[in-house]
């Protein structure tokens, strides 16, 4: 795979980076990595013999043959600068993943939302059908004990990252597109350019391979009209090749009949809630069916699937029967899907939302406010920058002002940081409420603090 023995990952705690590091370890490379934080992924890598450095230091990249970076690593990172000055080869993580996708028949999942859940479902289906795939997923998948697995089979299952266009580097044998939305506009500038990118990825699917496309997404339908000489299948709730019907939604999941071109394949049960997860499962069923895998084995795998961390995850219950949920959603479409699903509980919905990135807040503050209006009480904390530089005039107050103007009856609070958010949540929660921490940053710490010590005596003096 690589002409190197010792590989160093800058930012190894990231989901994509830690998964690649794990695969490299399993393939016999000597791996090290650095990050400003540790998490469950770095703990797992340590147990595999990976040297993890806390913080960044040029000394960390001494005596390595290759440095791997992601788009989150700034050009002035001291390890990155040191490697460049000494001509140590530097590889972007997308190029490393691209190398892997060339070695196997790769199933790549792309789209604005639902990538991690869909990738996990497909991986679990292949695992249960004894395909033994290599897996790289953007979350913790209990069945493989983490976010990566090196398999001996001919297939690889992974997420494709469209945020910076790097999905175009991958070579999918099977391509799943969950949806297309107006995200990452700081990079693409327009929705049309996003659609063009996905169309180009479809064009890379080789003869014998195929695409699986969400027909319920208008933007996906737009690119379907432009597909030429490629095999593809659609899924959705309407006139798709793979269709869900006779749907029953409940708090613990859903049930539905699945049809392939009007032929009933059978009834499916899911243990993850929400109509969006029905769509995710349909794409996994489509991949399974077209590959000729056993339908009953596939549906049993999907019924066992309990989700991945930070996707409508029930973290626990605190005093006064208050449910604590956490979700990674940060785009308006994701926020809406999560809140609509949690509305099934018929409880007062208290949402602690941490906006993700200044650029996304700049482009989508109105849409975020509209999505959050599905809650009963909203607590807005500071923007999680994800390494971005601040934009003058852009803050959580943009969303706050939108809510106050458009939804004057909605109870909304603006706080400066995570500690204040936890304190505010503690003070306003009532018996029988549902608390949701929402965002791609560290907002989950609010729920953790309340769960650790109880609502009334929570010690909120934890690090941010």
From Swiss-Prot:
Q: Where does this polypeptide localize?
A: Cytoplasm
Q: Which GO terms describe its molecular function?
A: ATP binding; UDP-N-acetylmuramate-L-alanine ligase activity
Residues in coiled coil: none
Q: Which GO terms describe its cellular component?
A: cytoplasm
Signal peptide position in this chain?
A: none
- Cited Gene3D superfamilies: Mur ligase, C-terminal domain, Mur-like, catalytic domain, NAD(P)-binding Rossmann-like Domain
Catalyzed reactions per annotation: UDP-N-acetyl-alpha-D-muramate + L-alanine + ATP = UDP-N-acetyl-alpha-D-muramoyl-L-alanine + ADP + phosphate + H(+)
| Sites where the protein binds ATP | 111-117
Single GO BP term = cell division
Enzyme Commission no: 6.3.2.8
Give the SUPFAM superfamilies listed for this entry: MurCD N-terminal domain (SSF51984), MurD-like peptide ligases, catalytic domain (SSF53623), MurD-like peptide ligases, peptide-binding domain (SSF53244)
Q: What does the UniProt keyword field contain?
A: ATP-binding, Cell cycle, Cell division, Cell shape, Cell wall biogenesis/degradation, Cytoplasm, Ligase, Nucleotide-binding, Peptidoglycan synthesis
> What pathway does the UniProt record associate with this protein?
Cell wall biogenesis; peptidoglycan biosynthesis
Q: Name one Pfam family in it.
A: Mur_ligase_M
Where primarily located? cytoplasm
Q: What is the documented function of this protein?
A: Cell wall formation.
Q: Return the similarity comment.
A: Belongs to the MurCDEF family.
Q: Which NCBIfam families match?
A: murC
Q: Would you tell me the protein name for this molecule?
A: UDP-N-acetylmuramate--L-alanine ligase
Species: Dictyoglomus turgidum (strain DSM 6724 / Z-1310)
């Amino acid at each position: 795979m690589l002409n190197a023995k010792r590989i160093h990952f800058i930012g190894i705690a990231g989901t994509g980076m830690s998964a690649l590091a794990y695969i490299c370890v399993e393939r016999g490379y000597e791996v090290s990595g650095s990050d400003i934080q540790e998490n469950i992924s770095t703990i797992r890598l340590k147990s595999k013999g990976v040297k993890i450095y806390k913080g960044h230091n040029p000394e960390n990249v001494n005596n390595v043959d290759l440095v791997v970076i992601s788009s989150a690593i700034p050009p002035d990172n001291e390890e990155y600068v040191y490697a460049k000055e000494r001509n140590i080869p530097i590889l972007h993580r997308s190029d490393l993943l691209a190398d892997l996708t060339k070695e196997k028949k790769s199933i790549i999942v792309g789209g604005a939302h639902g990538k991690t859940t869909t990738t996990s479902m497909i991986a679990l289906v292949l695992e249960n059908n004894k395909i033994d795939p290599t897996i790289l997923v953007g979350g913790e998948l209990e069945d493989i004990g983490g976010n990566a697995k090196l398999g001996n089979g001919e297939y690889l299952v992974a997420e494709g990252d469209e945020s910076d266009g790097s999905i175009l580097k991958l070579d999918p044998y099977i391509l799943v597109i969950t949806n297309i939305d107006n995200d990452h506009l700081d990079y693409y500038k327009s929705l049309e350019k996003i659609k063009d990118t996905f169309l180009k990825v479809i064009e890379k699917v080789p003869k014998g391979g195929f695409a699986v496309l969400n027909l319920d997404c208008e933007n996906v339908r737009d690119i379907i009209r432009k597909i030429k000489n490629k095999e593809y299948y659609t899924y959705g709730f309407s006139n798709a090749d793979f269709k869900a019907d006779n749907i029953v939604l409940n708090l613990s999941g859903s049930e539905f009949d699945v049809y392939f071109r009007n032929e009933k394949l059978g009834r499916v049960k899911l243990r993850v809630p929400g109509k969006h997860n029905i769509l995710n499962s349909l794409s996994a069923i489509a991949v399974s069916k077209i590959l000729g895998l056993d339908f009953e084995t596939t549906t049993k795998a999907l019924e066992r699937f309990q989700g991945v961390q930070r996707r409508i995850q029930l973290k626990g219950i605190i005093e006064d029967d208050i449910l604590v949920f956490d979700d990674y959603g940060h785009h308006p479409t994701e926020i809406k899907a999560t809140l609509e699903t949690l509305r099934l509980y018929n409880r007062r919905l208290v949402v602690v939302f941490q906006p993700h990135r200044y650029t996304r807040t700049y482009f989508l503050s109105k849409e975020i406010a509209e999505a959050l209006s599905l809650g009963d009480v909203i607590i807005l904390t500071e923007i999680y920058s994800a390494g971005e530089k601040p934009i003058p005039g852009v803050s959580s107050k943009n969303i706050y002002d939108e809510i106050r103007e458009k939804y004057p009856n909605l109870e909304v609070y603006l706080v400066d940081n995570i500690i204040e958010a936890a304190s505010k949540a503690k003070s306003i929660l009532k018996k029988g409420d549902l608390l949701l921490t929402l965002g791609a940053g560290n907002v989950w710490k609010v729920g953790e603090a309340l769960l650790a010590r109880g609502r009334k005596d929570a010690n909120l003096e934890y690090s941010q």
